[in-house]
Amino acid sequence: MEEQVANAIEIAGNPTSDQTLKAQAFDYLNQLRTDPSGWQVCLTLFTKTPQYSEIIRHVALEVVNSAAQAGLIDPQALGYVRDGLMAYLRQVYGQDNVTPDSTSIQNKIAQTITFLFSALYGNGWETFFDDLLSLTYKSSASTSHDNPLGIVFYLRVINAIHEEIGDVLVSRSRTEQDKANLLKDLIRSRDMQKIASSWQQILSEWRDGNDTIVEMSLRAVGSWVSWIDIGLVVNQTTLDLLFQQLGRAQKAELREGEEKVRDAAVDVFTEIIGKKMKPEDKMDMIIFLNLDTIVTQLSNSPPLHENRFTFKYDTDLAETVAKLVNITVIDIVRALEQDTVTADCKAKATGLLQAFLPHILRYFSDEYDEVCSTVIPCVSDLLSYLRKIAKVNPALAEQHSSILLPILKAIIAKMRYDETSSWGDEDDQTDEAEFQELRKRLGVLQQIVASVNEQLCMEAVSEVVGNTFESLRQSGAQLDWRDLDLALHEMFLFGEVAVRAGSLYSKGVPNNAAAERLVEMMLKMVESDIRSFTHPATQLQYMEICVRYSSFFQYHTHLIPTVLESFLQLVHHPIKKVKTRSWYLFQRLVKQLRTHVGNVAQTVVEALGDLLVINAELPTEGSDGDEMSSEDHEGSADAVFNSQLYLFEAVGIICSTPTVPADKQVLYAQSVLNPVFMDMEKNLAPAKANDERALLQIHHDIMALGTLARGFSDWMPGTSSPASLPAPEVSEAFMQVSEATLVALESLKTSFNVRTAARFAFSRLIGVLGSRILPQLPRWIDGLLTQTSSRDEMALFLRLLDQVIFGFKSEIYSILDALLTPFLQRVFSGIADAPTGTDDEVQLAELKREYLNFLLAVLNNELGAVIISERNQPMFETVIGTIEHFAKDIEDFTTAKMAFSVLSKMGSSWGGPDITPEGANGAAPQQQALPGFGQFMITRLSPLCWALPATPSFNSKDAQAKQVLAEAGGLQRTIYAKTGMEYLQYLRDRELPGMGMGADLVEEFVGALGRLDMKGFRQFFPSFIQRLSA
């Protein structure tokens, strides 16, 4: 059988094996894994001499591992595995072996041994550590750990055991954690002294002999220190050994692998400081270890000091030391923050903070971002502590300026692009993203500094910005773009201090001293020659700042032409990233300065003309064959078009300002519209023939038309009807847009993209056309709700219709009356189609809710009569039927709740005046009663309230179920308000007894309905049902 298993492993692992044979081999090995006796043959395969190939031995041991972890090996048999593996280890690792196992095999054995430790150390293998330690000696006569192969394996297992039971980053179940804690307790009580002694001895005996052994020993000490007695590590013997290894940092040249030993020694100190202790003990520990001196010596070592600004600079060591500084300072600040620590402890912490401040600044200002990032947590903690005490005693803020100022200067300096950065390079996108993330984190720190001492921050930023603009004035384009970018970035951040309620000004004057400074900075920036901003990064910053502080221009209107001229240059930028971003920023700027830009409308329209040409490009395929979506890349054709739309909106905004006469508005609008109309006309025939590019071109054209309309009107559907529609001649121009869109839609309504664009245009045209659009509503519905429209499309259009109803309720009745039945028939067909997957189910639920929302919009806007008009009455039964169905849907409580809301509203609308006090409607206007509706509510709607709780799977304690029941209770209270005693009598005589309810419960329910108001009964009904269900 051994040969059979070995053969199967060889076949499975050979890339050239026949695929059928390979599949059979995999099946065989999978069966072997679950075979209770499979592990035995695999253990033999692994330990046999002469040895099988590495892949056979690796897979064989893997089978043993999985069998042990799956519980296929009983405790007694685990002892057999232990004996087999230990015999192998003594034979192969217990002596000088010319061909040791590979690292992957060693790791696999260590994994198995670690599992056996977990299973047997508590009971069955109490000599575990003695047995492993015996491997570190060449013979029983050895007086020192003289077997390097055995030592490496012993340390490999030691480190694996920490990962198994001590590593806090490993996620464990409660049971696993309890077991880990038990094993740690056993080690501490049985073997810890012995293990710690072995580390000391190995470090001492091999300190200069084998870097791998020394590094693994240090890793073991560093990892285990977190859960063992600190005295086993912090003692003179061990510390002397650690200091010896730290001494390697003083070497100018290290042999290969030696730097790992040095870094591991620093990490031991980091782990010691990271160990949980009382603040008093931790401060004493920092002082005892003399960490200030250690860090100073490391910082002054050749790799970090002499090599600092050279290519030899050791960033790994810098990051390692930075970790030590970070964890130490975090603990110092923690001691300072705690109110419960002694005065002596606080004094020690204060002294340590002063000692470590140079170390913080040294690594925080390191030119390598990964080193700087390492100490950001401790800088953040320190600044947060200073902010906390400054709030308690503002006078202390000034005292701490000696700490704050150098940190602030370091923050600002680190925000500068370094000399090696090349902005916009495709190959450097990761570096750019990481730098921007670092800037973001540094920006947070700067805001904390500002909150501690605003004046200090103001002076520092003013100095950087002022000096930079002075240099710009003198040297112009020769100024390093990185310096200008830094100044602009600081201006952008400064708004966090200067801007209040979205503006630099309050009642016409700057908000505060910071706002005054920022106004000065803005004057210097805008008055600088834009041609000096030669780098794309600074050009983008310039635009971002103008938009962020647009309120500045409302009080310096003489500068608006200068800024607009700059923007009009930048919207034609040769770099796509700058150009497309500038389109968005231009739209933002003119929107915020709308009242001041009408006088340049013609100039702007003419200047933008070449950028308003629409050129649809089909998505290109990525390297994996998938189409790139617009979100995939900012430079994709889709993303560029989405940015281009901002220009159409900007034109609409500028052309529609009150200072532009109506005839000019029409002229400018038509200069943009006519080319688009011509393009649509040209592409309509090929689009009908399913030419994909022509269809996309029509989509883009319609989106552009809708976006131009959005620029002309501020009104958003669903808020209220436009307070003042554009001039009639402007609206007339946009009627052409509506007509052109409808013509395209009617011809291409099977295209999802065209429908999507048309729906967008429709929502935007409402704002410029107002009620003029209503007569076209049947055509819009016919084009937007087709046989191929998805439920999602229907739901979105229903939402739009809600807004139309709200905006034009006084004018829409006759149109709504004419289109309601065919419209609802399409919605019903969407609801009736069976969903085919999760996405479908989500869309169906959304469509149901939007349908109910639509009915509520009709009823709430006093248009309920349209549902029961002569034309739509044949549809009434279907409407009620769908609502009844939703009200009984136990799978969708949200929809059920809405269904009861709609029924209650129908009752309020058509049930006539309230005949009981405290009716459902309160002071709402009463609508004319629908004859027979009172009886309809009693016999048809009332039983619905009991249908859902009668479902066997209904849980009356569920929070959402209670909400549905409260709504059902509201419907019952509405029926009672409209029908009074007739309803109570019906409940008492027929409905409740018919459900099998006893006389006492009937009287309780009827009494509550007659006695309680709406709020009271909505609370009563869920609790009544809960008692019935108990």
UniProtKB/Swiss-Prot annotation:
Functional note: tRNA nucleus export receptor which facilitates tRNA translocation across the nuclear pore complex. Involved in pre-tRNA splicing, probably by affecting the interaction of pre-tRNA with splicing endonuclease.
Alphabetical keyword list: Cytoplasm, Nucleus, RNA-binding, Transport, tRNA processing, tRNA-binding
Superkingdom in the source lineage: Eukaryota
SUPFAM superfamilies assigned: ARM repeat
Name of a matching Pfam family: Exportin-T
Record protein name field: Exportin-T
Keyword tRNA-binding set for record: yes
Cell compartment(s), UniProt: Nucleus; Cytoplasm
Main location: nucleus
Record carries keyword Nucleus: yes
One GO MF term attached to the UniProt entry: tRNA binding
Family as reported in the entry's similarity comment: Belongs to the exportin family.
Gene that encodes it: los1
Originating organism: Aspergillus niger (strain ATCC MYA-4892 / CBS 513.88 / FGSC A1513)
Biological process per Gene Ontology, one example term: tRNA re-export from nucleus
